UniProtKB/Swiss-Prot annotation:
One of its GO terms (biological process) is regulation of translational fidelity. Belongs to the GatC family. It comes from the Bacteria. This is Aspartyl/glutamyl-tRNA(Asn/Gln) amidotransferase subunit C. Allows the formation of correctly charged Asn-tRNA(Asn) or Gln-tRNA(Gln) through the transamidation of misacylated Asp-tRNA(Asn) or Glu-tRNA(Gln) in organisms which lack either or both of asparaginyl-tRNA or glutaminyl-tRNA synthetases. The reaction takes place in the presence of glutamine and ATP through an activated phospho-Asp-tRNA(Asn) or phospho-Glu-tRNA(Gln). It comes from Burkholderia thailandensis (strain ATCC 700388 / DSM 13276 / CCUG 48851 / CIP 106301 / E264). Keywords: ATP-binding, Ligase, Nucleotide-binding, Protein biosynthesis. The lineage of its organism: Bacteria, Pseudomonadati, Pseudomonadota, Betaproteobacteria, Burkholderiales. It is an enzyme of class 6 (ligase). Gene3D superfamilies: Glu-tRNAGln amidotransferase C subunit, N-terminal domain.
Length: 99
């Protein structure tokens, strides 16, 4: 898949982006290089290969990189709702906007 300069300008217009011609040409080159890489990866025969969530774990013993899920700060609902103009049962009351 290869994009044209017209495609890039159309996409920029749809995204409401102002793009100079030089920027559009540079973006076109970068996108086409990216799509070329994707085509190369799609050409690789992966028949019989199971998908891996973390492929590096297959070749290295890696410790879990994610931190423990622990509470680091406590939220005091009453303090947060004190400046609100209207609160009821721990919920913010707002004006009805859709009838």
């Amino acid at each position: 898949m290869a994009l044209t300069l017209t495609d890039v300008k159309r996409i920029a217009h749809l995204a409401r982006l102002e793009m100079a011609d030089a920027d559009a040409e540079r973006t076109l080159t970068q996108l086409n290089e990216f799509f070329g890489l994707v085509e190369q990866m799609q050409a690789v025969d992966t028949t019989g290969i199971a998908p891996l969530a973390h492929p590096i774990e297959q070749i290295l013993e890696v410790a879990q990189r994610l931190r423990d899920d622990v509470v680091t700060e406590h939220v005091n609902r009453d303090d947060n709702q004190r400046p609100a103009p209207a609160v009821q049962d721990g919920l913010y009351l707002v004006p009805k906007v859709i009838e």
